[in-house]
Amino acid sequence: IAWSPNDKKISFSHTTATGVELWVIDVALAKATRLTEATVNANIGSPFSWMNDNETILVKMLPKNRAALLDAKKDLPTGPIISNADGAKSQNRTYPDMLKNKNDEINFENIMTSELYKVNLNGTATLFKKADMYAGESFSPDGNYLMLTTIQKPFSYIVPLSRFPSK
């Protein structure tokens, strides 16, 4: 849920059986309107942010050419999993639910990849940035600049997402 900068509208996501939709509420009219189909990518962080014009929302959307997830039971890795352990003490902590193999890497990248769209209040969506693994965005105080953070490869099998390389 996010208020528009002028506090006149509220945007929110709605999870359906087929995905996540973006909706907006006009507070004065007490009316909710769906802006997108169930194509919002809400897998990390906030999937949308208001722009300073109060009329446009920056939205992470699933790429139109998104591949299906790999099934570990059907899709075999292309090579062995190699791990080097020399018996020396390590400073690394252990974490649950880490990437374990190439299939996990491919599925992780697939799930994290979004296209950024500008969606106006009548639901018109315009591609703003091509597909990438967007982890966050931050507008400058005057709204004239946007800083995007993307997750970069190589992925790690020993640290969590928060410690993956980013740009």
Language model segments and positions:
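Beta-propeller folds
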Residues: I1-K167
